[in-house]
Amino acid sequence: MKSASNPSEAFESASKAEIIDRIQQLVPPGSPEPQDPEILATLQTLTAQLIKAYQADGQLESEPFNDVRDRTIYLYASAVKSKIRGKTILITGGEGCVGSFLIEKLLELGATKIISADKARCQNPAEKFPLFNREGAVTFYATDIRNFEALKHIFEVEKPAIVFHLAAQRQPGLAEIQIRETVTTSLLGTQNVIQLCEEYGAENCVFSSTGKTSRYFTTEVYAASKKMAEWQFAKAAQQGNATYGMVRFTHMLENSLFCEQMSKKAEQGKTVNVHAPHRYVTAQNLIEAVHLLLNSLVVSIPGKLKFVAVRNLGWPTETLEVALYKILESGKNLPIYFQGLLPGYEEPFFLGQFDWSKPTDIHLLINVLEDPFRIVDDAGDMVSAELAPFSLRVLDKQVSNLESLIRNPDYPEVQIKHALVAAAKEVIASSFAWSSAEDLLKILHSGINPKKLQGYGTEIADYTEIIELLLQGIYGRLNQEVLNSAGVTADEFDDLVESLSTVDSIQAEVGYLRSVSKYLREVVPAAQFTQKKSEAVAVRDAA
């Protein structure tokens, strides 16, 4: 850390960026929490000035998530009531934040028999669920879904017709520490739920996932394990007898780790730590979450996995703004500092996730390959889509390999993470093989635009693994028609190739792209491709 100096005069009229830069100079990201009184005093002054700078821009007038807290989505209550009438309903993770609220809503809608299976068995269900006023309406089991026999006992005794599968690790940061537990819960726990739904004739099963799975590729344990679970459900929907549905949640306000942490620091008068400036989250509330879960019962169809999400998530909210509001609300003169990104939150955003040619139509939880399946419900509040196609054979092989590794108690946790990421990569590669070359080229082109990356503070090398996967999917499939369909001109294609040439690990693929460019410019007249459809030209060996 650098020594402090009085910034009051120099930064009285400074911009946000200048003040943030000064804070980071004083306490570089990655440093421990500052303890030096002089540095803390300077941080207090800088934080107060940053609050004024935000206020000057019309911010911090109200709680940043106010609009999210007041939102709701239409609940197809009549259809849901009809669906659950007389049915036994099982909720894994029933004593978590969402599970608890779901139980209350189901009771309100007339459910007469609800089963909760949760590792953390609650001690006072009557107090936790005030609507629990009918003898025997809710039964609580202390069960880890990874324990097949324990879960089987519940299915054997209770015979649930409807299952909501919510049990999972909820903290991305903790997932990077408790790797084995996170992966086994997502992989083995999900497999147990699906298998028992089929064996005991469940009618419907709804899975709660995360918007982080809209990333094509991820090395984060939390998101990668959820992607594997999504693929398991997609397979079950195609091959099983039950009807499967899925919900993608984003940041849950009532269950927000960073909001809780910031509020506690402000209440205690302590230094408030923020991961980094310019970090944004999209959020939703519990009412939206539970309505999505219940509506999924209504919109799910046999033989296909449809996932639902809130249609209008609003503008993303900056976490720094939330921290400053918490301090302002406390009435205390508290300092902030930027601790740096932690494992589970480090992955940079990949611009190719969305189709930027239609910026007003982007949905933050649906990627380019899922977007063609997007449908808005009749009420206009909810959107549904489907996963991009992938190889079931590849999934089976990767799940089998992963299961054999994670069942070995001596297998190192860090190796479990590597195996998880490698497995997800294989399934993603199979999905890209199904995808059109036009879509993959469009994703690649928009994903590594140097000027845009500079604005995000990232560089092409930060996306090496997803670039490798995209190039693998494109290899041998490019021609002029593909470039035209992707909206990529010959000059833009050449610029793309030059940008990619800076990545050492893909030089063979860059050589292929150069061959394509040369072939299309010198061998095939451009007019030929605008007058008639052409066959894909494999030019792997073109000089």
What is the predicted role of each segment?
Residues 401-543:
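C-terminal non-catalytic accessory extensions
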Residues 142-184, 216:
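NAD(P)H-binding glycine-rich loop region in Rossmannoid oxidoreductase-like domains
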Residues 85-87, 202, 305:
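Phosphate-coordination loops involved in phosphoryl transfer and adenosine-cofactor binding
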Residues 299-399:
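Mid/C-terminal beta-alpha module of Rossmann-like enzyme folds, strongest
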Residues 221-302, 316-330:
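NAD(P)-dependent short-chain dehydrogenase/reductase
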Residues 2-162, 512-515, 519, 526, ...:
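N-terminal Rossmann/SDR dinucleotide-binding element
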Residues 165, 177-180, 184, 188-227, ...:
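Conserved Rossmann-fold NAD(P)-dependent oxidoreductase catalytic core, especially the SDR/UDP-sugar
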Residues 92, 117, 163-169, 205-211, ...:
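SDR active-site strand-loop-helix element
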